[in-house]
Amino acid sequence: MSDAAVDTSSEITTKDLKEKKEVVEEAENGRDAPANGNAQNEENGEQEADNEVDEEEEEGGEEEEEEEEGDGEEEDGDEDEEAEAPTGKRVAEDDEDDDVDTKKQKTEEDD
């Protein structure tokens, strides 16, 4: 029984947080947005227009992807940059491991 009470209180907390988040978003946007995020009346026509623009951008994005496939040089350049970043991190991690090994060796020598 006490478990059910805990679940109910956590649900209320979640709902409260969602409501607060919506209020903050409305204040930031400077306009009232529907709670469900869907534009259902004329007052929210701006959201409908935004959705149409997003669809157009998505269509344009597909064309850009096709163009990028033809240019192998650009893709290779991007991949090189991405490959360098993780390598640098690995080097730092290896340095830390070396420090630990050094400490272990000193301990073994002392014994």
From Swiss-Prot:
GO terms for biological process: chromatin organization; negative regulation of apoptotic process. InterPro entries: Pro/parathymosin. Pfam families: Prothymosin. There is a cross-link at K103 (Glycyl lysine isopeptide (Lys-Gly) (interchain with G-Cter in SUMO2)). The modification N6-succinyllysine is found at K15. The modification N6-acetyllysine is found at K15, K103. Residues 13-31, 101-111 have a biased composition (Basic and acidic residues). It is found in: Nucleus. The modification Phosphoserine is found at S2, S9, S10. Residues 1-111 are annotated as: Disordered. The keyword Transferase does not apply. The modification N-acetylserine is found at S2. Covalently linked to a small RNA of about 20 nucleotides. The modification Phosphothreonine is found at T8, T13, T14, T102, T107. Residues 43-84 have a biased composition (Acidic residues). The modification N-acetylmethionine is found at M1. Keywords: Acetylation, Isopeptide bond, Nucleus, Phosphoprotein, Ubl conjugation. It comes from the Eukaryota. GO terms for cellular component: cytosol; nucleoplasm. One of its GO terms (molecular function) is histone binding. Interacts with NUPR1; regulates apoptotic process. Belongs to the pro/parathymosin family. Prothymosin alpha may mediate immune function by conferring resistance to certain opportunistic infections. This is Prothymosin alpha.
